[in-house]
């Protein structure tokens, strides 16, 4: 999976898909009442990027729906997976549940069109703080209450704070997410700091967990990876996805002889909740 990083304005969807992304990551901010507000990152952000692009969440979700709805003039068939980087820092452990409910209702209304022929992309809820696991509980509850529990088949989960894997598993279980129930595990650092500085130890532990008989992870992705050497290192470590500001770099690496016969770009027909076994 080539995961386009920080796609916060609608026009950037085409920009990143044109460069080779089959997945995008979008930042979502929240107000003091736990209501999502904008698709917005703000400063600081990755080097070589403008940090202030934004849309109102409703507007972005409407544009995203069009980009992932077959038959729409804006449809991009390559775009199969969307990661919502949920900026829950201003939420408390008690308001996280409310935030999840409100975001679930918002997705149902603006992305899934009330469950009637909305966008088809798979969705990952990515949360930076393990203490906010109740966001997931609230999100699931909102869809169940609305009578659209079936849409949870399209929803996966990630904690992005580089926490201990055992603690991450516990937080997921507290949220009502079973082991290997649509679980992606991220690991990474801003591109302003070399990925060599962070190293790949935790990535390798996550891959080992994914491949073990008693793990909790379905897929592993590494962020934010823009340099050719770092892409190769991540692929060699066995990741399923690479989050990047430069999708074309990942495309070029995948076309190298070492990887060409072994790896390919995922399509909509590839279930992102199934662990890949080569």
Curated annotation (Swiss-Prot):
It catalyses: an N-(acyl)-sphingosylphosphocholine = an N-(acyl)-sphingosyl-1,3-cyclic phosphate + choline; an N-(acyl)-sphingosylphosphoethanolamine = an N-(acyl)-sphingosyl-1,3-cyclic phosphate + ethanolamine; a 1-acyl-sn-glycero-3-phosphocholine = a 1-acyl-sn-glycero-2,3-cyclic phosphate + choline; a 1-acyl-sn-glycero-3-phosphoethanolamine = a 1-acyl-sn-glycero-2,3-cyclic phosphate + ethanolamine. Keywords: Cytolysis, Dermonecrotic toxin, Disulfide bond, Hemolysis, Lipid degradation, Lipid metabolism, Lyase, Magnesium, Metal-binding, Secreted, Toxin. Its main location: secreted. It is found in: Secreted. Its EC number is 4.6.1.-. One of its GO terms (biological process) is lipid catabolic process. It comes from the Eukaryota. The keyword Nuclease does not apply. Expressed by the venom gland. Mg(2+) binds at residues 25, 27, 85. GO terms for cellular component: extracellular region. It holds the Pfam family GDPD_2. Binds 1 Mg(2+) ion per subunit. The active site is at 5, 41 (nucleophile). Its cofactor is Mg(2+). Disulfide bonds join 45-51, 47-192. One of its GO terms (molecular function) is toxin activity. InterPro entries: PLC-like_Pdiesterase_TIM-brl. Dermonecrotic toxins cleave the phosphodiester linkage between the phosphate and headgroup of certain phospholipids (sphingolipid and lysolipid substrates), forming an alcohol (often choline) and a cyclic phosphate. This toxin acts on sphingomyelin (SM). It may also act on ceramide phosphoethanolamine (CPE), lysophosphatidylcholine (LPC) and lysophosphatidylethanolamine (LPE), but not on lysophosphatidylserine (LPS), and lysophosphatidylglycerol (LPG). It acts by transphosphatidylation, releasing exclusively cyclic phosphate products as second products. Belongs to the arthropod phospholipase D family. Class II subfamily. This is Dermonecrotic toxin LhSicTox-alphaIV1i.
């Amino acid at each position: 999976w080539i995961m386009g990083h920080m796609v916060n304005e609608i026009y950037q969807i085409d920009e990143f898909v044109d460069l080779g992304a089959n997945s995008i990551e979008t930042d979502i901010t929240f107000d003091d009442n736990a209501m999502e507000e904008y698709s917005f990152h703000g400063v600081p952000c990755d080097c070589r990027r403008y940090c202030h692009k934004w849309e109102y969440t409703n507007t972005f979700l409407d544009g995203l729906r069009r980009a992932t709805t077959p038959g729409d003039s804006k449809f991009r068939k390559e775009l199969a997976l969307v990661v919502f980087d949920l900026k829950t820092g201003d939420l408390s452990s008690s308001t996280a549940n409310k935030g999840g409910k409100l975001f679930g209702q918002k997705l149902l209304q603006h992305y899934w069109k009330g469950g009637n022929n909305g966008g088809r992309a798979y969705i990952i809820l990515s949360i930076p703080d393990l203490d906010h696991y109740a966001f997931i509980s609230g999100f699931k509850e909102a869809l169940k209450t609305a009578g659209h529990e079936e849409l949870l088949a399209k929803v996966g989960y990630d904690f992005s704070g580089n926490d201990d894997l055992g603690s991450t598993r516990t937080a997921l279980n507290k949220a009502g997410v079973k082991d290997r129930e649509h679980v992606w595990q991220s690991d990474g650092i801003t591109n302003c700091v070399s990925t060599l500085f962070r190293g790949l130890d935790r990535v390798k532990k996550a891959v080992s967990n994914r491949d073990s008989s008693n793990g909790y992870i379905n897929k592993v992705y590494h962020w934010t990876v823009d340099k050719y050497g770092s892409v190769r290192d991540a692929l060699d470590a066995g990741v399923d996805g690479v989050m990047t500001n430069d999708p074309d770099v990942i495309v070029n690496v995948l076309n190298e002889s070492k990887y060409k016969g072994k790896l390919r770009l995922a399509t909509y027909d590839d279930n992102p909740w199934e662990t890949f076994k080569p």
